[in-house]
Amino acid sequence: MKSARRRSRELATQGLYQWLLSGSPGGEIDAQLRGAQGFDKADHEHLDAVLHGVIRDSEALSAAIAPCLDRPIEQLSPVERAVLLVAAFELKNHLDIPYRVVINEAVELAKTFGGADGYKYVNGVLDKLSAQLREDETQAARKR
């Protein structure tokens, strides 16, 4: 059974995918997500924070992700880009969520919504990004 937090990440990823493709306002996407299957079982507070936070901070998040990529962020598939934005937002703003959990959840999102090997790429990018954004936490984990 999926956790409420996982459902909120799935819905945020779907909403951000739509936002990346259509450029629709966040409020419009939010309204559509409220009618989506699984919304009633999602962590609404986390969904709102992630969806609106990523849209608000998308330039800064993309700038943080860019050095970890092997190509311009615009060349990523919209699914990979949405997943990376969700994870980057959580890494930067939700320090209560361990970085390994953020990476694992992003890998699961990439497996669910992305191409065959997209999850491997997401994992590699987030490994680099977490080392930058959560240097102390990642170094402590690697010393164990």
From Swiss-Prot:
It comes from Paraburkholderia xenovorans (strain LB400). Belongs to the NusB family. GO terms for cellular component: cytosol. This is Transcription antitermination protein NusB. The keyword Signal does not apply. Keywords: RNA-binding, Transcription, Transcription antitermination, Transcription regulation. GO terms for biological process: DNA-templated transcription termination; transcription antitermination. The gene is nusB. Involved in transcription antitermination. Required for transcription of ribosomal RNA (rRNA) genes. Binds specifically to the boxA antiterminator sequence of the ribosomal RNA (rrn) operons. GO terms for molecular function: RNA binding. It comes from the Bacteria. Signal peptide: none annotated.
